[in-house]
Amino acid sequence: MNAQVTPMMAQYLEIKAAHPDALLFYRMGDFYEMFFDDAVAAAEALDIALTKRGKHNGEDIAMCGVPAHSAESYLLTLIRKGFRVGICEQMEDPATAKKRGGSKAVVRREVVRLVTPGTLTEDTLLEARRHNYLASYADVRGEGALAWCDISTGDFRVMRCPAVRLGPELARLSPKEVLVSDGLDIARQDAIIELGAAVTPLSPGSFDSASAEQRLAGLFSVSTLEGFGNFARAEVSAMGALIDYLELTQKGALPLLRAPRQQSADRLLQLDTATRRNLELTQALSGGRANSLLSVLDRTQTAGGARLLQRRLTGPSTDLDVIRARHESVSFFFSDTLIRDDLEAELRRIPDLDRALSRLALDRGGPRDLSAIRDGLSGAARLSDKLKIVDLPPLLEGAVQDLQGHDELSALLDEALVAEPPVQLRDGGLIAPGYHAELDEARTLRDEGRSVIATMQADYVEATGVNALKIKHNNVLGYFIETTATHAEKMLNPPLSERFIHRQTTANQVRFTTVELSELETKILNAGNRALEIERVLFQSLRDAILNCQDQIGQAARGLAELDLSAALARRAREGDWTQPEMTEDRAFMIEGARHPVVEAALAKDGTSFVANDCDLSAEGGAAITLLTGPNMAGKSTYLRQNALLVIMAQTGSFVPAKCAKIGLVSQVFSRVGASDDLARGRSTFMVEMVETATILNQADDRALVILDEIGRGTATYDGLSIAWATLEHLHETNQCRALFATHYHEMTSLASKLDGLTNATVAVKEWEGEVIFLHEVREGAADRSYGVQVAKLAGLPDAVIARAQVVLDALEKGEREGGERKAVIDDLPLFAMMPAPAPAPSAPSLVEEKLRAVHPDEMTAREALNLLYELKAELS
């Protein structure tokens, strides 16, 4: 070691060497300091000053720091920028260090926690309404498994996951961090990173299934995992790696994880990554939660209810009984608005039980986590009392039963805690007066020392009969009893001398003490510290009582979330005039008056109504496909998306925006809409489209719903038409699924006469005086043109370009009608002049316009105005 290295810096270097992959927050008094490369990286990431402290190997030591009291905000910034942070705390005070090792002793420090994206628990570092998942992927002899947990709520699950399903499942969960074996191929690690998760490679030993089983059995205090499920080796391996990582990052203080729940992919509606993105389930394409389906659905009052909504929306059920039970619960609150309003008013006061419990388990909780548990359980009890006398559907009845069973803990917390505890335990004042006699005494001595002394003085005056007796204080004797020499004689002799102990005689005064006064003096001098120490002990006692009831608290949290979600979906259904879908085992798909929930909500803000449309894709024994044609901007993509969204909403457990809906269970939803490239992988927009289409054709089963928008548009016309044609035939003949297929290749409409399960539909438009009016109505039939030039005009292309485009279009269409070759037609077109073509002459005024110009509204009677309106209507038709 360099002889010039100070003991403190030697300690830092030793601790840093043990945590090379993390920024080290090294506690020094009221600050966390960072040194060397850590300081350079942190200063840049946090935009704070970079300074220096001493030298090492002849070079200045870079240094920066952040205040300990506001460290969480800096931690959040660093975590979001991809850093891992080691929290290195002082484990003793300087005075203790000096007693241990002399004046040059260094305060003992240890890393108490590694902060990573998937291991956050503090409210300030988390999104209250979203899970913060840590996931782990294991591959054992070609068998894959995915495990995930949220240590801030205790949620812990696992499922078998073939490599081909890893991307879609991670897209469903949106974990913040994914643990993988360091032998996992780089391409797959990059794919995980593209989903927005941090990838943390671990050694193969972390995934060893034998040691993993031992870790899990030890965590849950069982001899075997068979009571939790029949886990495959890969599942055990993935779960074990999670526990191993938590032991590493939490330094042995493991979170409260519920027993692992085995999840089956067959019981969830399958949605791949592209479909989730295209349908904007939880995040809009523009980024953020706003204008996503989740934002439109969410009327929950609690954080737990919001997380449950996201979990179900990202993983809708395919179990008919489960779906119907959820609909029945929503229907109850949809019908009984008084009970729902009363429930929601109570739910607004419910804190986040799960996260408060998790922080207490990890010893990161404070007084307000105790009060959060108290307030949450009190609210649960009030709701239970109100709802247990109501005739509820089975799912809600079970939720209400979950709210019970914690009366003793609730009574304890009600008695022990003040109404509004402090944020920090060190501030004191969390225990209610009257709960603990010794604490009350300490507080009284601390806050009312003078009055206690005065009371004691009055007692002594009465006991001695010496009215001149006083209790005084100085820095030498402390508290003492003083009286004149004249009266002292009485106190120096029995029986009073047995109680009053002589301490000092001065020229005119005699001073005494008593055992009671000496004890009181000690108590007064130490009362403040004693009160804090008693509260610390009581805090730990209450924390232990809460942790002993963790199962009941978790159960209550789940019951509250279920009630909240059912009521929230009912409120949203009432607001939007939504209907309960009829769910069936067959392949029915009949929706009348369907509306896009997100678009409708956006239009409503501007006072515009949404044009509803029907959809019938019912199929038994074969495919049911609608081929949709029509112009751009007419609403084809909206129509495709809305029907897919209604399926997802229905199988989530929500009502749907429609007049009525009958939906046979859907196993998969695939969406190929929109345009995007993947430049990082060298993929063009067309290549991305083809990859997504290939996924659909290879994976869609006969219970899938597929929506395809303009397949083949990114290449030459005949190439694109050929691909679209073959894709449609494959969906019909091989996949035999329900599908909506939008295209501008009008030639494909002829397939309806050849494919039994194919019908044509078009989005209606109206032409009026050279303008196109989009009616947004889906009707049977086929479009004969796409109105691309008119849409280009609406987009603001220069008039010269529009005029030239119309000339070219007319020539091409004429060539097709006359059977000429396209090249010959193009060769016959006049060259585009260098000067812009003259703007088209204004069209002559129509009869309607001429009549309107001649009208003077103020001079017309109501009858004349009505007659004129009928005349104008006749002219239009």
UniProtKB/Swiss-Prot annotation:
Q: Which GO terms describe its molecular function?
A: ATP binding; ATP-dependent DNA damage sensor activity; damaged DNA binding; mismatched DNA binding
Q: Which GO terms describe its cellular component?
A: cytosol
Tell me the keywords, alphabetical order: ATP-binding, DNA damage, DNA repair, DNA-binding, Nucleotide-binding
* InterPro entries linked: DNA_mismatch_repair_MutS, DNA_mismatch_repair_MutS-lik_N, DNA_mismatch_repair_MutS/MSH, DNA_mismatch_repair_MutS_C, DNA_mismatch_repair_MutS_clamp, DNA_mismatch_repair_MutS_core, DNA_mismatch_repair_MutS_N, DNA_mismatch_repair_MutS_sf
Q: Does the keyword Phosphoprotein apply?
A: no
Name the SMART domains on file.
MUTSac (SM00534), MUTSd (SM00533)
Residues holding ATP: G630, P631, N632, M633, A634, G635, K636, S637
Instruction: Give yes or no: UniProt keyword DNA repair.
Output: yes
Q: Which GO terms describe its biological process?
A: mismatch repair
Listed HAMAP family? MutS
Protein family (similarity comment)? Belongs to the DNA mismatch repair MutS family.
Q: What is the stated purpose of this protein?
A: This protein is involved in the repair of mismatches in DNA. It is possible that it carries out the mismatch recognition step. This protein has a weak ATPase activity.
NCBIfam families given for it?
mutS1, PRK05399.1
The name this protein goes by in its record? DNA mismatch repair protein MutS
| Gene of this entry | mutS
